[in-house]
């Protein structure tokens, strides 16, 4: 199955489960969790079901395209459903079947691995899902986001698309993956990967990055004070990515790292509180929405 077909198949599968299908969020982030469609929607009592592919950036993971299974830019497929439905593990296994994995014939294990994002003030209990010894998915019941308790508890399912593709295509190098029947993953992303690694490790200006971090932090703080959680989150994400760039340059000491993570986490808490206040003032409108039955088409 081609890389783009994995995304199409997961879109179709999760749409059939009632998920809203969305597109990637338009700023740098280290994980699909950081999209407002997950990190904000996980907060508060309103029901939510969403699925989307998300490009992710982790500057320190770059290897100039020389590593067969590691890159600073990669893709996740993100699912968030709140409240967590009964039988979600079986539904997830059905999604693997939709991708062509006969679950009865393969070794699929749920290996306990609780998840945490210190910068987001988020954590959950869950598992890594291993397919024949390779981790392909993270399965997490969120307990907190932005330092706020999640009630009801959502389920987050995060597929590593490259790893799934390597398994499905029986390929050992991500750059050799077929994107479609004409182009490889490397055709599309390898040149960009090399250039971005140069920036991450050599060409970026650490002093300028530190200035940017301070500016983004100030902007986020001002927006939180104005009770504007959506744009404030954008600048929190910019803080997070800039911090990751500084780490890639090797200019963050252990003490600075702890302090900087604390600064970002404090901002994330402010965004979460502002979001919850905003939704409460609106009367939590999604609590009153009635879903259309799946067997009834929209009426024009």
UniProtKB/Swiss-Prot annotation:
It comes from the Bacteria. InterPro entries: aa-tRNA-synth_II/BPL/LPL (IPR045864), Gly-tRNA-synth_heterodimer (IPR006194), Gly-tRNA_ligase_asu (IPR002310). Pfam families: tRNA-synt_2e (PF02091). One of its GO terms (cellular component) is cytosol. Keywords: Aminoacyl-tRNA synthetase, ATP-binding, Cytoplasm, Ligase, Nucleotide-binding, Protein biosynthesis. One of its GO terms (molecular function) is ATP binding. It is found in: Cytoplasm. Its main location: cytoplasm. One of its GO terms (biological process) is glycyl-tRNA aminoacylation. Tetramer of two alpha and two beta subunits. This is Glycine--tRNA ligase alpha subunit. The gene is glyQ.
């Amino acid at each position: 199955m081609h890389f783009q077909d994995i995304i199409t198949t997961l879109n179709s599968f999760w749409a059939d489960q009632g998920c809203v299908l969305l597109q990637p969020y338009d700023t740098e982030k280290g994980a699909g969790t950081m999209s407002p469609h997950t990190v904000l929607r996980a907060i508060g009592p309103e029901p939510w079901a969403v699925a989307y592919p998300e490009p992710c950036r982790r500057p320190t993971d770059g290897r100039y395209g020389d590593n067969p299974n590691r890159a600073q830019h990669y893709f996740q497929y993100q699912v968030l459903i709140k409240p967590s439905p009964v039988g979600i593990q079986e539904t997830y296994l059905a999604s693997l079947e939709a991708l062509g994995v006969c679950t009865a014939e393969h070794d699929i294990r749920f290996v306990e691995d609780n998840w945490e994002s210190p910068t987001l003030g988020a954590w959950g209990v869950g598992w890594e899902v291993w397919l024949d010894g390779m981790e392909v998915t993270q399965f997490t019941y969120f307990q907190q986001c932005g330092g706020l308790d999640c009630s009801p508890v959502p389920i987050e399912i995060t597929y590593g698309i490259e790893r799934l593709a390597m398994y499905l295509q029986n390929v050992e190098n991500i750059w050799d993956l077929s994107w479609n029947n004409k182009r490889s993953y490397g055709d599309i992303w390898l040149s960009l990967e090399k250039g971005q690694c140069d920036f991450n490790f050599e060409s970026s200006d650490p002093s300028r990055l530190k200035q940017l971090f301070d500016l983004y932090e100030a902007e986020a703080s001002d927006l939180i004070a104005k009770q504007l959680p959506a744009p404030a989150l954008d600048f929190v994400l910019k803080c997070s990515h800039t911090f990751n760039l500084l780490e890639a340059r090797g200019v963050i000491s252990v003490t600075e790292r702890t302090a900087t993570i604390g600064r970002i986490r404090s901002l994330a808490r402010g965004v979460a509180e502002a979001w919850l206040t905003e939704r409460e003032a609106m009367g939590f409108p999604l609590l009153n929405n009635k879903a259309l039955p799946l067997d009834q088409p929209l009426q024009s």
